[in-house]
Regions:
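Active-site alpha/beta core segments
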Residues: 34-145
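Short glycine-enriched, charge-decorated loop/helix-capping segments at active-site entrances
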Residues: 20-29, 122-126
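Extreme N-terminal starter segment of soluble prokaryotic enzymes
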Residues: 2-9
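Short acidic-hydrophobic, aromatic-tinged amphipathic segments that line or gate anion-handling sites
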Residues: 200-207
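Histidine-anchored nucleotide/phosphate-binding helix
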Residues: 35-39, 155-166
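Short internal beta-strands
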Residues: 47-50, 170-177
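Short, well-ordered alpha-helix to beta-strand connector turns
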Residues: 6, 43, 104-105, 168, ...
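Short, flexible loop segments at boundaries between secondary-structure elements
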Residues: 173-187
Length: 207
């Protein structure tokens, strides 16, 4: 596969709280860093996303008395999984993993910073009427093919890939550069959605 000037690598949420020892650790999450470092030099354009929640965020189980992490509730924009407190603005858990070294990244996109709305996708809040601005950023730069890596495969990576397709972009998920939470078969469910949407799954060796 030839990587061109119209391609962008989007590295999703490689942060301390999603890696080993973190508040919402994804199993083997740290392993994506080596793969990302290996493929990153092939891309002229790169964007990092960073989960960036205020304390007391509505997606935290602790904000809903009597609720526990991983339960589902209904919020104004639909179903919301409740999470342990994680990636709180300014905390060590919200920092990028210290081994992640991507100084060539052109943009750091913070998401989930609105108190009452969660944000899995790099393109939209969980309320799909609220864009993050990434679509416009890519359009201005004529970037039409999006390669996704990071955490977690079945949530923030997956939702970003699906939204890329809805916006008319080509979307590739680099499987060995991702790890999944895989809660209640969430990995297989997102893959079924990938198939319907035309998201392409590849390994890093194809890049």
């Amino acid at each position: 596969m030839q990587i061109t000037a119209q391609d962008v690598l989007v590295v999703i949420d490689v942060q301390n709280d999603f890696c080993s020892g973190g508040a919402l650790a994804v199993a083997d999450g740290d392993a994506v860093i080596e793969v990302i470092h290996r493929i990153a030099p092939k891309f002229e354009h790169m964007i990092l996303t960073q989960d960036w929640h205020p304390a007391g965020h509505s997606s935290f189980a602790s904000a809903h008395p009597g609720k526990k992490p991983f339960e589902q509730i209904e919020l104004s924009y639909g179903a919301q999984t409740l999470w342990p407190d994680h990636c709180i603005q300014g905390s060590k858990g919200a920092e990028f993993h210290p081994a992640l070294r991507l100084p060539q990244a052109e943009l750091i996109l913070r998401k989930g910073y609105r108190l009452q709305i969660d944000s899995y996708s790099a393109f939209f809040e969980n309320d799909p009427t609220i864009p993050t601005g990434l679509a416009g950023y890519l359009e201005e730069r004529k970037l039409t093919r999006v390669f996704l890596a990071g955490l977690a495969y079945d949530y923030c990576v997956g939702y970003s890939a699906l939204d890329a397709r809805r916006l008319g972009l080509q979307a590739y998920v680099i499987l060995d550069a991702c790890r999944a939470i895989d809660m209640e078969s969430s990995a297989s469910k997102i893959e079924a959605e990938f198939d319907r949407a035309g998201v392409i799954l590849i390994e890093s060796e194809a890049v």
